[in-house]
Regions:
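Active-site-adjacent structural elements that line small-molecule/cofactor binding pockets in enzymes
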Residues: 1-208
């Protein structure tokens, strides 16, 4: 390590922890962000950007992407020089009952993320800022079992991709196919066959 900055330095590298040289070269560094300042930092300094799962298509298109574009222009990089990764919230299953269980799990995740003050800006973007405050009150009161009930179908649909396994791929591509370079998906409870078919749906799209 040999970094000496204005405010801090990284220079201690004991031999025990010093990595061997790699033929792969310098590893890429991706940064995750939600708010505008960190999004700009990620665009100007990193090799790629990791979208937070608590993101909607509208927030990504209208907030994150313009900031990423401006950040790349500031350091004279093209969009093709940069990678965007996203792990969207998915509710799917191989039966109606399984889909309903997945939906309730996703409601819980949205409620948990939504209770965080640092993510209020995403809800504010949709005019749902009061929801964050209500979720935060329940979290502080340790009434976490009640939080998911505040996530109505409109909020759910904005944050999550929902449907049978053969409906997920087309929805992901319609929402995010022209935005992201890499999709990380974690649909729980699918058989290997159903998961394989979902991945085939995504891989069938030719690269630009």
């Amino acid at each position: 390590l040999n970094f000496y900055g204005e405010y801090y330095q990284h220079s201690l590298m004991p031999k025990t922890f010093k990595p061997a040289d790699s033929e792969a070269g310098r590893p890429q560094i991706f940064l995750s962000a939600t708010g505008p300042l960190m999004t700009t930092v990620a665009a100007e300094t990193a090799d790629g950007f990791i979208m937070h799962p608590f993101s909607t298509e509208s927030y990504i298109r209208k907030v994150n992407l313009p900031l990423i574009t401006a950040g790349l222009e500031a350091v004279e990089l093209e969009r093709s020089d940069y990678a965007i990764d996203f792990s969207p919230l998915i509710a799917t299953g191989e039966s109606d009952e399984a889909i309903e269980r997945a939906i309730e799990q996703v409601r819980g995740r949205i409620a948990f993320y939504g209770s965080t003050p640092g993510y209020k800006m995403v809800l504010d973007h949709h005019g749902w800022g009061d929801l964050q405050e209500a979720l935060n009150r329940l979290m502080k009161a340790r009434r976490t079992d009640e939080m998911a009930s505040l996530i109505d179908d409109e909020v759910l649909a904005a944050f999550a991709v929902i449907g049978a396994p053969d409906e997920i791929g087309p929805q992901l591509l319609a929402r995010y196919g022209d935005i992201v370079d890499r999709l990380s998906i974690q649909p729980e409870g699918l058989s290997e066959t159903a998961l394989g078919d979902l991945l085939d749906d995504l891989k069938a799209v030719p690269e630009a």
